[in-house]
Amino acid sequence: MNQSSVIEKLHRVYTDFLVWKSAEFGKQAEQDIGGEWECNYAAMPEVWAACFDFVQQIPAHAWQPEQARQLLYLTARDNESEYIAGMLPESALLRLCETYRQQPAYDAGWQLAVQLPRLSSQAVAWQWAEFFCNDPDEYTCRRALMVSGSLHAPHTER
């Protein structure tokens, strides 16, 4: 599959998911819908495949901002299985952390924080863990604090 097809596939699964969400829940914000609602999306395996192909074939530094936001949103919506977050290469994980810093997506921050121990640079992992510890979302903060402890990050005791 060529890069153009991979990019189109990511965009298609993103827009298809939004259409489904709108049909099922109207204009409700994700955090107001309730738990595990994304599990009812029958096409989630297609989302996983599109995200996997995208991060494997398109270098993170080459992503357009909109592509990064779409991948971040889909990662957030995969919060029960955490498959997307778990398969991100390091460069993609870091790019999504930066995208989250610029424009957070509900349920994405804690998933990114949980993946920080995979980073090759302990200093970078500490930096991002501290960032997520200060997230306005309480659950993201808690998960980031647990990760900080496992990383033996200096900010953990503050």
Descriptions of predicted regions:
Residues 62-69, 89-102, 122-134, 153-158:
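Amphipathic alpha-helical scaffolding segments comprising HEAT/armadillo-like alpha-solenoid repeats
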Residues 8-17, 95-96, 101, 108, ...:
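Aromatic-residue detector
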Residues 1-82:
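N-terminal alpha-helical scaffold/docking segments in eukaryotic complex subunits
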Residues 34-43, 52-57, 69-89, 107-121, ...:
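Structural detector for internal amphipathic alpha-helices that build alpha-solenoid repeat scaffolds
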